[in-house]
């Protein structure tokens, strides 16, 4: 039994070794065949790539030649020594002056010195400028057109002022600084200035100081309703009185206004007041000239 077991062990070991050797041999054989095929495949691929490169190179040369052949007619401007000696088409050089430069420029853009898009871009850039200037000029003309119409409307305004054929000139006799004028003192001053109590319960200055003739100007109370009561003047007081005259009036309007101004100044002196203009401001020489100008305007308006 021991011998049989030993024999089986030896046979098994030999079988295992044989299998290992056979596996190593087959693996080496496959590797050697792979390495042998790889150089062949690489050479074949290199040849195919080289062949494809040659075909592409030939195509490129053809395209370059075609592009090089196209601008040959434009080489007539160059010197004969600059033309390449390889091309046989450089022989018809003496025949080049016959065709004009303008004719081929429309058919083939290679004959012209400038690219076709550059020549087309020029009119396109100038065309939009013209409508812009026209659009800008139109509103400018529209804005300036109505300008002369404004003074035409304002011109008739000064003509309406001389049309006044009558006016009222007013003077005020006022107490000082918020004071009041006593009724008795006022009555004495008014009577001494030639006024007479009359219509509308106010005082009037007639052409005749005695109270006869047309009325030249009148005197009223500064406080509404502007009337007086001569019987109660002792109990009466007022901040001031107003003297007014209509223009045109009887006689000379300038002399009547001068008389009215003198009467106002006399009453102011009697009652201790001051003479004010129609705006209740202190009388000034400039304001007197304004009164005289108003009188002249009314006289001129009535004379026409």
Swiss-Prot record:
It is a single-pass type I membrane protein. Pfam families: ZipA_C (PF04354). The chain crosses the membrane at residues 6-26. Residues 31-165 are annotated as: Disordered. Residues 121-132 have a biased composition (Basic and acidic residues). CDD domains: ZipA. Essential cell division protein that stabilizes the FtsZ protofilaments by cross-linking them and that serves as a cytoplasmic membrane anchor for the Z ring. Also required for the recruitment to the septal ring of downstream cell division proteins. Belongs to the ZipA family. This is Cell division protein ZipA.
């Amino acid at each position: 039994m021991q011998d049989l077991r030993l024999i089986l062990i030896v046979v098994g070991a030999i079988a295992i070794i044989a299998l290992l050797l056979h596996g190593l041999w087959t693996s080496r054989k496959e590797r050697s065949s792979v390495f042998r095929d790889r150089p062949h495949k690489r050479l074949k691929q290199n040849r195919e790539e080289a062949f494809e490169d040659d075909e592409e190179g030939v195509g490129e040369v053809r395209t370059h030649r075609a592009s090089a052949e196209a601008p040959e007619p434009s080489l007539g401007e160059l010197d004969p020594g600059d033309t390449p000696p390889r091309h046989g088409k450089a022989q018809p050089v003496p025949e080049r002056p016959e065709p004009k430069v303008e004719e081929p420029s429309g058919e083939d853009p290679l004959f012209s010195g400038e690219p076709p898009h550059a020549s087309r871009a020029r009119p396109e850039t100038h065309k939009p400028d013209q409508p812009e200037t026209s659009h800008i000029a139109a509103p400018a003309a529209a804005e300036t057109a109505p300008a002369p119409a404004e003074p035409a409307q304002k011109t008739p305004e000064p003509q309406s002022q001389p049309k006044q054929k009558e006016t009222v000139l007013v003077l005020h006799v006022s107490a000082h600084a918020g004071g009041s004028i006593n009724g008795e003192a006022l009555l004495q001053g008014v009577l001494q200035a030639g006024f007479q109590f009359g219509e509308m319960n106010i005082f009037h200055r007639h052409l005749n100081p005695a109270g006869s003739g047309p009325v030249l100007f009148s005197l009223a109370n500064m406080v509404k309703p502007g009337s007086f009561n001569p019987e109660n003047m002792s109990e009466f007081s007022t901040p001031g009185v107003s003297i007014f005259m209509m223009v045109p009036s009887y006689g000379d309007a300038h002399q009547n206004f001068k008389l009215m101004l003198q009467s106002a100044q006399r009453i102011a002196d009697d009652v201790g007041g001051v003479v004010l203009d129609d705006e209740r401001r202190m009388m000034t020489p400039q304001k007197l000239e304004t009164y005289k100008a108003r009188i002249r305007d009314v006289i001129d308006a009535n004379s026409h």
